[in-house]
Amino acid sequence: MIDLRKVRNFYIACGYIDLRLGIDGLAAVVKQQYGSHFDEESLFLFCGRRTDRIKALYWCGDGYILLYKRLSNGRFQWPRSEAELRLLDPQSFRWLMEGLRIEQKTAIRKGKPRDLF
């Protein structure tokens, strides 16, 4: 089974992908289009034109695991600008899964130190 705590590299395939592709098709896209290789620390994420569903491909050591998530309400904030493979940190992955953008502005503005009394 997949343990997301062991995943160190979250790769997001920016742009559109045909979500009718299964394990073999998505693995071929990763290897041929992006020139990347699978390991047990990497999870590859894909999104189609409808941004309410994504697929994730993970190599668990003895085979592939294909994960599929469809939102019942809302859409993923998926980057569409480039057809590239982008590496996300775990925080950006959590933001994406929670429906937020992966590039967040600063949530709390920096302040200046001041006297409290």
What positions do the PLM features span?
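Polybasic/polar functional segments that serve as interface/processing modules
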Residues: 1-117
